[in-house]
Design a protein with these regions (language model features):
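Negatively charged, low-complexity tracts enriched in Asp/Glu with abundant Ser/Thr
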Residues: 1-25
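A general marker of short, structured functional hotspots
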Residues: 9, 29-30, 44, 62, ...
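Compositionally biased, intrinsically disordered low-complexity segments
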Residues: 11-14, 30, 35, 64, ...
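Generic "edge-of-domain/loop-turn" microfeature
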Residues: 15-18, 34, 53, 66-68
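A short, structured beta-strand/loop element
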Residues: 23-59
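Mixed-charge, Lys/Arg-enriched low-complexity segments
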Residues: 51-92
Length: 92
């Protein structure tokens, strides 16, 4: 699959901010189109927001902040129920 994609819709997202509201990590459940495929797909996007805007860089986050980000995404219903059930099985 080509890396070039266009976000059609952000369905839900969880966010964790640090160093003020301008810097945040997000997990988004979104519908996207890839440039080499004409079908919309629902995906999870892990994003870094710098200065309030999506940064074109890797999201690098320490484990404690990741737990806070994951909790925010969970509380915001980013994950489908079947995904939550699969995660519960992994964590047992």
């Amino acid at each position: 699959m080509n890396n070039s994609m266009r976000t059609i819709e952000v369905i839900n997202y969880g966010e964790h901010q640090w160093d003020g509201p301008e810097n945040a990590a997000r997990i988004e459940r979104a519908r996207v189109f890839y440039s080499d495929d004409d079908r919309a797909r629902e995906v999870l996007k892990f994003c870094y927001l710098k200065g309030g805007r999506h940064a074109r860089t890797h999201l690098t986050i320490d484990q404690d902040d990741f737990v806070k980000l994951f909790k925010s995404a969970f509380d915001s219903n980013v994950f489908k129920p079947e995904v939550i059930n699969q995660l519960r099985k992994i964590l047992k």
